[in-house]
Amino acid sequence: MKIAVLLSGGVDSSYSAYNLKEQGHELVGIYLKLHASEKKHDLYIKNAQKACEFLGIPLEVLDFQKDFKSVVYDAFISAYEEGQTPNPCALCNPLMKFGLALDHALKLGCEKIATGHYARIEENDKVSYIREALDKTKDQSYFLYALEHEVIAKLVFPLGDLLKKDIKPLALNAMPFLGTLETYKESQEICFVEKSYIDTLKKHVEVEKEGVVKNLQGKIIGTHKGYMQYTIGKRKGFNIKGALEPHFVVRIDAKKNELVVGKKEDLATHFLKAKNKSLMKDFKSGEYFIKARYRSMPTKAFVSLKDEMIEVELKEPFYGVAKGQALVVYKDDIVLGGGVIV
């Protein structure tokens, strides 16, 4: 089978390509220029070229920087301006890696596209679904919730059945040159954020804009440095007059540049709503597991789909729900779909 492999210049994607080559597939390497400096791209392209030379496969470099800026980066900035906490990875995957890059791979005659994502593919009744990775500590299924089933059927995740701790020694044994590759230290959460998201925002919008902090009764009790510097659940960075106990951000009013704070129990919610992105129209209401944050544990809930809105009633309270984050619905370890929390 002819498969395109997205190569980042790192160990995971290189070892993914190695595994597929060992299985006898015909491969085409693809490096995506989405963001970052030309200096970084030059280094990572050089790394990807070394992997391709080792495997005896061609490498193509695709420049999608303009597309990435318009559909992912600018949306990230806008969401924070609106007082939300966006999830750019969940937007990038369907639009860039498994959108534009997949389209290009198909034009090259490839049947599928592979990446180093930690996730698996499951087929039920001839429909392809995203499934959690074997290594739950590295699972990335949450970020893949918005993919259409027709797209999922064209994906390959060679690392999905492996543990992260095992991959580096396996990769170095198979491809010794990987141990000599230079890399840059990247953000663990958002790939285009080098230091903090606030530093990224400062390049485009006024972040240092002092405002007031109110309690749940509407009384002004302190000040903050600018609403975009806070997310739901944050407990530091603002001044509360005479505070004797911790206060947490429970609401952000972007238009008024105000924060509303309360106690930890005030963060609790039993009900969530999200604008549907990928739950199928014939979705049956019932009890499922949900995630409302990447690092959160799956939580049992009653989930229903009404007029393009996903409604969730939680068995146990969820703390710190932020607008703009992804709400992902699971049946056991299978992703059924999800949406954006409103």
From Swiss-Prot:
This is tRNA-specific 2-thiouridylase MnmA. Residues 138-140, 293-294 are annotated as: Interaction with tRNA. Its main location: cytoplasm. Its EC number is 2.8.1.13. The keyword DNA damage does not apply. It is an enzyme of class 2 (transferase). Keywords: ATP-binding, Cytoplasm, Disulfide bond, Nucleotide-binding, RNA-binding, Transferase, tRNA processing, tRNA-binding. The active site is at 92 (nucleophile), 191 (cysteine persulfide intermediate). Disulfide bonds join 92-191. Catalyzes the 2-thiolation of uridine at the wobble position (U34) of tRNA, leading to the formation of s(2)U34. It is found in: Cytoplasm. GO terms for molecular function: ATP binding; tRNA binding; tRNA-uridine 2-sulfurtransferase activity. It catalyses: S-sulfanyl-L-cysteinyl-[protein] + uridine(34) in tRNA + AH2 + ATP = 2-thiouridine(34) in tRNA + L-cysteinyl-[protein] + A + AMP + diphosphate + H(+). HAMAP family: tRNA_thiouridyl_MnmA. One of its GO terms (cellular component) is cytoplasm. Signal peptide: none annotated. PANTHER family: MITOCHONDRIAL TRNA-SPECIFIC 2-THIOURIDYLASE 1 (PTHR11933:SF5), TRNA 5-METHYLAMINOMETHYL-2-THIOURIDYLATE -METHYLTRANSFERASE (PTHR11933). The record marks 117, 325 as: Interaction with tRNA. Pfam families: tRNA_Me_trans (PF03054), tRNA_Me_trans_C (PF20258), tRNA_Me_trans_M (PF20259). SUPFAM superfamilies: Adenine nucleotide alpha hydrolases-like. The gene is mnmA. ATP binds at residues 6-13, 32, 116. GO terms for biological process: tRNA wobble position uridine thiolation.
